[in-house]
Amino acid sequence: MAAEGALIPLCPSEALLDGGKGVRFSVLFRGERAPAFAIRHGGQVFAYMNRCAHVAMELDWQPGEFFEPDAELLICATHGALYDPATGACRGGACAGHGGLRPIALFESEQRVWWLPDAQTQPLSDRSPPVAD
């Protein structure tokens, strides 16, 4: 298990374009392997568990495709739930009343995006980076 506060390299900064394709990766969430993703919106990087708040399904309709056509909101391809890319909060659709996306802490430095594990989200192993699915 990685120590809390230990930064783990996720991807080069250039891999995340504003409103573009996200980077998928896997984490241990509460001890179980789970999908996650990172995106860039408004010049900042954000990451979330890849799990709709409405029904526990992955959001992307094609691998890494998380934004709706205007690239303003994240969308669940299954039921159309809409989420704020900067907060993960439900902004409409099927997620209303079900909460939002579970955030994962990221940090950007030296042209890299780093993941900051916490008590619930850990890397799959201490020896392997959280590579894209």
Residue ranges and their predicted role:
Residues C52, C76-H79:
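Short cysteine clusters
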